[in-house]
Regions:
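Asparagine-centered strand-capping/turn motif at beta-strand->loop junctions
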Residues: 400-404
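Aromatic-lined carbohydrate-binding/catalytic grooves of carbohydrate-active enzymes
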Residues: 26-29, 50-92, 208
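Single conserved hydrophobic/aromatic residue that forms the stacking wall/gate
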Residues: 1-8, 13
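Ser/Thr/Gly/Pro-rich low-complexity, disordered linker/stalk segments of secreted
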Residues: 461-537
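Active-site-proximal helices and loops of the catalytic beta/alpha 8
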Residues: 94, 98-100, 124, 185, ...
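The substrate-binding groove and active-site-proximal loops of carbohydrate-active enzymes
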Residues: 23-41, 73-86, 158-173, 190-199, ...
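C-terminal beta-strand-rich structural cap/linker in extracellular carbohydrate-active enzymes
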Residues: 432-463
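Aromatic- and acidic-residue-enriched segments that line the glycan-binding/catalytic groove
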Residues: 37, 70-82, 110-149, 231, ...
């Protein structure tokens, strides 16, 4: 068994998150002309009851502050984006969330600013004489950009619209820490999600962590990290949590490829980092909707059962609880960030099987501490069935999932009780000789708890007639999308199994990992590490002066000094091709 370890704040470990991209959800204009504020944020007030109804107890919302476009090119950290309203609107919104016992986490875009930020505008005006010259990285008056400023500078992601802050400058650190203090005093925010945390300076993050401890008890810092060893960020000195992109990839590809080995192996890989409390998700404002990503829409159920029961903190991206679709476009993320009206989904918890499932899982998680704090133990694993336990204080909760089009029988070691009850179906099974024998329906999941541990529950209903009705209603209310979501059953019927019988494959235990995915993460197979590179890193060079190949080799050399370097470790290094991220990684070695 693997026990979880708590790193710093326990504030959000028990929570289930809801994630809102406000400029998209409110239908705000794509470009900010800095005109009079329009209080679009107030249109999100009715969403608060919905967030609570589906069992979410924390809200990550952002970006929120004044910017010129998508929100990540901040021009004023202390003013709500005028397309969303006024600071008073934001203060009232947070207060309304708190009234419903929902914590609020802001998006903190501290790696870079927009070109309209006061410090950058001062450099444009005063050039070499600007007192803010060292607020940004590598300002060079011998260069130029497409904006014809007469100087060049370091940007983020190749976009000169996003000007990289010099986070090692004490003035910048103090300014951003003051921003955090302002957000707490003005808006009573409960935490911050740090954008692009994988390229933030580690000393800068330590300063943010010290400020977090100062401003509010259990103030929570969560970072956006794509690749790497998450324990470099999640520890007692830097962040409380980071985005779990490794599990995100495994959850959809593990179902699309009928490969639960990938998911189970990813969980072990993450546990070996130190049993961190990671921010788990199946979609967000940067990646395709899970309903679009799944080859078999019926897998919506087992995917979300795993999201809510595996170690970590679960998050639902707005709209995905309704089963809406969203396909990533080549030059725009607008399709991932649609405007929605909550009135169009007024009865979703009662009528939409996707929403009903999410609401049930949220309630189950709230009433089952083992899902937040319990140790993790794998019980049974094939490529199509997976069972594990979460154990806490002598109580064993058992989770079963099945990605096959047929039902499956499982015999599993139980806890010290006489009977278990399925929290999603209400089905009861006796404990016999220390085991429970359960049948897991096709393309479904179940959470088994000792009878009496759940004070009340409402089994999820997925009658075909209701689903067809929801499909018709959803097609009407989401007509602006390129393809309306087919609200299909989330627990398979006998008719579905019979219709697909010819597609059923014999049970396999070999790896069937995805051949294509958004990113590379550990899977249950021998990892073919990249061939050894001929580049030899000069360790006397500063990390900033090394190129990507040199940084990779320097990191591997540092790893070798701490012990054997496995093929998986090499692959993790070679998968990271971002210069800033590699610089921070190399600096993190002591």
């Amino acid at each position: 068994e693997i026990m979880p370890s708590l790193v710093g704040s326990e504030m959000c470990i028990r929570d289930s998150f809801y994630h809102i991209y406000p400029l998209g959800l409110t239908g705000a204009p794509k470009h900010n002309d800095y005109s009079a504020p329009v209080s679009r944020l107030n249109t999100l007030l009715p969403w608060i009851d919905h967030i609570r109804e589906i069992g979410c107890t924390a809200l990550y919302i952002g970006p929120l502050f004044e910017s010129v476009g998508h929100g990540y090119e901040t021009t004023d950290y202390k003013k709500l984006d005028s397309r969303l309203g006024t600071n008073e609107d934001l203060k009232n919104f947070v207060a309304a969330c708190h009234e419903k016992e929902i914590k609020v986490i802001f998006d903190g875009v501290f790696n870079h600013t927009g070109r309209d930020f006061f410090a950058f505008k001062d450099i444009q005006q005063n050039r070499e004489h600007s007192r803010y010259l060292n607020w940004y990285c590598n300002v060079n008056f011998g260069g130029n950009t497409e904006y014809n400023d007469g100087f060049s500078y370091e940007n983020w992601g190749g976009y000169n619209l996003l000007v990289k802050l010099n986070q090692r400058n004490p003035e910048v650190q103090n300014y951003i820490c003051d921003v955090i203090r302002f957000w707490v005093s003005e808006f009573d925010v409960d935490g911050i999600r740090l954008d692009a945390a994988d390229v933030l300076d580690f000393d800068f993050m330590r300063a943010l962590r010290r400020t977090a401890a100062e401003v509010k008890e259990d103030f929570w810092l969560m970072g956006e990290v794509i690749h790497g060893d998450y324990s470099r960020w999640v520890n007692g000195e830097t962040l409380h949590s980071v985005t779990n992109y490794a599990l995100h990839k495994a959850l959809y590809s593990g179902h699309n490829d009928h490969n639960y080995f990938e998911i189970a192996h990813t969980v072990k890989y993450l546990q070996n980092m130190g049993n961190l409390d990671l921010y788990n998700f199946v979609d967000n404002h940067d990646v395709e909707r899970i309903y679009t990503k799944l080859s078999n829409k019926a897998h919506f159920a087992p995917v979300h059962v795993l999201l809510y029961t595996l170690p970590g903190v679960p998050s639902i991206y707005y709209g995905s609880e309704f089963g809406i679709e969203g396909k990533k476009e080549k030059f725009s993320d607008d399709s991932l960030r649609p405007a929605l009206d909550i009135k169009d989904y007024a009865d979703a918890v009662q009528k939409n099987p996707c929403t009903a499932l999410i609401a049930a899982l949220g309630k189950i998680r709230q009433h089952t501490p083992a899902l937040s704090y319990g140790s993790y133990a794998e019980l049974q694993l094939t490529n199509r069935q997976f069972a594990f336990a979460r154990d806490l204080d002598g109580i064993r909760v058992i989770v079963t999932v099945n990605n096959d089009d047929n039902a499956a029988d499982m015999s599993l070691p139980a806890g010290n009780c006489a009977e278990y009850i399925g929290t999603l179906t209400g089905r009861k099974v006796p404990v016999q000789d220390g085991r429970i024998n359960v049948t897991v329906a096709a393309n479904s999941g179940e959470i088994w708890v000792p009878a009496g541990e759940m004070p009340e529950y409402i089994p999820v209903k997925t009658e075909t007639a209701d689903i067809e009705k929801v499909q018709e209603e959803t097609e009407e209310t989401t007509s602006t999308q390129t393809e309306s979501p087919a609200q299909k059953t989330i627990t398979a019927t006998e008719e579905t199994a019979a219709a697909k019988a010819e597609d059923i494959q014999p049970e396999k235990t070999a790896d069937t990992s995805a051949t294509s995915a958004e990113s590379s993460f550990p899977e249950n197979k021998e990892v073919a590490a990249e061939p050894a590179k001929t580049v030899i890193a000069d360790l006397n060079k500063s990390p900033e002066d090394m190129n990507v190949d040199e940084l990779q080799q320097a990191i591997l050399a540092k790893m070798a000094g701490n012990g054997p370097v496995t093929d998986q470790m090499k692959k993790t290094v070679y998968d990271n091709i971002w210069h800033d991220s590699l610089v921070n990684w190399l600096k993190s070695f002591h």
